[in-house]
Amino acid sequence: MLTAESRLLTLRRCRVTRQNQLALKSIVWILCLVPLVVLAYRAATGNLSANPISFLTNWLGQWTFRLLLATLALTPFRVLFGISWQISLRRLLGLFTFFYACLHFSVWILVDHFFNWDQMVVDIVKRRYITVGMLALALLVPLALTSTKGMVKRLGGVNWRRLHRLVFVIGMLAALHFLWLAKKGRTDQYLYAAILAMLLGIRVLDAVRRILRKRRQAHGAGMSALVRRSS
């Protein structure tokens, strides 16, 4: 039987072919649509709780944040386990995050407020959880619009990466949205915030590690050059 270490080594050496990549993305597509199918089934069977509007809004909002966390988890997964084939799923998960965020927003506009623009403006200004939620959605828009390979080439790799670092800000805004919105007695918002903090912490530690390694390499190269000159 394979040990956990040998299974990890196998995953690290695994090269995803084009066929396997398409199969993997197809599976992710299906999994990302499952929450929507479940929601449609519950709506069709009249099982949306005593407050259907609140249930719809919360369901779509929670899945938006879960998909955002899944997107943010791809790089930490590579850092921790040395596995990188899952990075190819980042664009797909990011677009599904935006898709669910738009559905969440649409329910708020169409069902909750029914195009009452004056009331929506008042809510955005007065209710801080709506304020940060709207800001998070606004920041998601440029990331979704620039997710194509053509936009990466047009913006340039460096500028594109700088723009897409907004996802970290979006994650923190989403966490605040849930923390400020949650009712007393609920704990899931703290779990989401803790997961986000852990994922961002792994990224920060990895960035520090890479900076220190580059400094050591530069110092080693400088010492080698000094020794050669002195000899």
Regions found by a protein language model. Give the residues of each.
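Membrane-embedded alpha-helical bundles that constitute the cytochrome b-like, heme-associated redox core
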Residues: L2-S231
